[in-house]
Amino acid sequence: MSTKFVVCHSRKGGVGKTTLAYELAWLLGAPLVDLEWEGGSASRKWGYRYEDRTSSSLLAAFEKGTPPRLLRGFNKPDLVPGHPDLELNQPSRDGTADALLKWAGEWGRDWVVVDTHPGATEVVNGALSIAHVVVTPVPLRSSDLDGTEHMVRELADYPVVLIPNFVPPVAPAAEVHRLGRIVDGTPVQVGPLIPAALAVGTRRKRMAITSEDPPAKALQPVATALRQVAAFVQEYTA
């Protein structure tokens, strides 16, 4: 069985990347590999505290070449937790790719979702190199579109799908047109949009939004959109 890799990546922080990775991992039944070393990571969202551990299973797995043990919880994705020390102890691009492929073979899942640190580093580039789809949330804001434009120029030959995120009820026309211009002439695709909802940012539950049936009323349009994104990813990689 060949595992498909979904890599959630952007060149800017604060765009909703981690939430999207978390929800996609749940919807696809995928382990979530957290390669983020800053605060606000998927690991913290999951309830994992590296401060309470004496070592990092992620760093040990990269060093020893053995698959890390997946952490499991209720109504949230299985997790390989990240660690701040990854920033200064990154494996090479090829070392990262080889490790992720080996782990996926051991886990035997159809999908693996990888959440990355913003920007281009060795460990990030390793994950991108094996991605079947690179999912990038894009708020329709000038500075975020600047970062997206730069990323598309660099990664136009990668399987990139842009997901308009935090979209207000009336989307800003100028930014919508700019997004179209950014992908024009490239194979980069634009997937389903995710509507803005203040409740996403203030929610404290660790469970995936899409694990609740039904979620809170304010989150229901977001949950519907997330399921549409998951379906798009499945069709894209079919």
Regions found by a protein language model. Name each.
Residues 129, 153-158, 183-184:
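Short, conserved loop/helix-junction motifs that constitute active-site signature segments
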Residues 30, 112, 134-135:
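Short, well-ordered beta-strand core segments
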Residues 119-142:
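Inter-motif core of Ras-like GTPase G domains
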Residues 91-99, 150-171:
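P-loop/Walker A phosphate-binding loop and immediately adjacent motor/lid segment at beta-alpha junctions
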Residues 31, 35-108:
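P-loop/Walker-type NTP enzyme "switch/lid" segment
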Residues 209-238:
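NTP-binding/hydrolysis catalytic cores, primarily Walker-type P-loop NTPases
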